[in-house]
Amino acid sequence: MRARNVLTLVMTFAFPVAVLAQGSGKTNAKPTPKPAESRLVVVPASDMKWTDLDPAGAPGVKVADLWGNHASSTFGALFKLPAGFAAPLHVHTYDMKVVIISGTYIQAPEGKPEFRLGPGSYFLQPGGNYRHTTTCDKASDCVFLVESKGPFDLNIVDARTAPSR
């Protein structure tokens, strides 16, 4: 008799709770959304598509877009400056995250000492009114990765001003 009472108690309370807990099979957990770019992209260095950035204004400077488009939108791209290249005092509209891959990249903020960065170095360059010159050391070409939330631009502050090296 006692076993029958226990069984009745279990069936009365435990079974409905188990059914309610199981419900319709739906849960409150939301599926994890897949990122927009959910495909593998592999581009060996030998397959990079390098183009001239601005043959008239920046001779020899090359760019290879990795994602986005450096000329019109958010982007990530490799830039290549020829050894000894020097850009005059200028600003950019958007912030840029930069990682040096090869060569010695030299930047001189207006009125401040220059900094020289080698492979593996990183800097965040503010957009807007950050006036600076950019030079690639004469020893070798400079290659660096740039990521930006907006298109690349180079607005010369004074075309007569060039870095003194």
Which stretches of residues belong to each language-model region?
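N-terminal post-signal-peptidase region of extra-cytosolic proteins
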Residues: 60-66, 77-85, 102
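Ligand-binding loop in jelly-roll beta-barrel domains
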Residues: 118, 127-152
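Glycine- and acidic-residue-biased ligand/ion/polar-headgroup-sensing regions
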Residues: 82-85, 92-111
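Short beta-strand His + acidic residue motifs that chelate non-heme Fe in jelly-roll/DSBH
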Residues: 87-89, 106-108, 131-138
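Short acidic-glycine-tyrosine-enriched beta hairpin
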Residues: 71, 110-129
